[in-house]
Amino acid sequence: RGGNNSLYLADVKFTSVFLEGTKGFDAILPEAAECRLAGFFDKPELTSNTKLLYVHGAADDYTLPKPCEDYVKKIKSAPGQVEIDMKEGWYHGFHYGQKPKKYKAMTVSKCPAFFVDNEGYVVGDEWPELVLNKYKLYSSIDEFYDTAQIEPKKAWKTSFKMLKKEKCLDRGVTIGGNHMDEYMPQFINFFKENLL
């Protein structure tokens, strides 16, 4: 479940830890992921046998569509292996069966992006600068990585407090939609075409 999990499982660097070779799921359909702060690989590569359809509401103000469109476009893959469908006027939760309405949910779209290299180390200087120098949360980058691996919940809570101090968190999103009947044929047909 979830767009983030689907995108993790689509990457050969992730699946190769559990499976031999470059193959993974035959079909993956991520929806409305949070692509800037999820810790995705900076140089994503799709598993060799996977067909991926990425769907996102173009009006989504909770998990922004543009960063995900950009991320999915840079996934290394064979021609025709990846398709992106941005749904005009659709919000987050476009298939919830309820009229879109405002919620005070928190967003992170103004916070520094967090991507990792093939070894799992953060890409760029922004996060190390924040956690080591500006807020002095860790004495070294190794301590930061160790905490993230050994105590991920603690590392996230510490980072979240830092993001609050950075004033990059925001509140107020639109969630909902009655697009299930419109979307379901595309959803079902994608899996029929790629699994049967």
Where are these regions (language model features)?
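The feature captures the conserved acid-bearing segment of alpha/beta-hydrolase catalytic domains
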Residues: 20-89
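Short glycine-enriched nucleophile-adjacent loop
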Residues: 3-18
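C-terminal catalytic histidine-bearing segment of alpha/beta-hydrolase fold enzymes
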Residues: 81-196
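Catalytic nucleophile serine of serine hydrolases
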Residues: 1-2, 32
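Sec-exported extracytoplasmic/periplasmic mature domains
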Residues: 10-14, 76-77, 192-196
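Short, flexible micro-motifs
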Residues: 5, 35, 60, 92, ...
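Glycine-rich, phosphate-binding/catalytic loops in enzymes
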Residues: 14, 70-73, 103
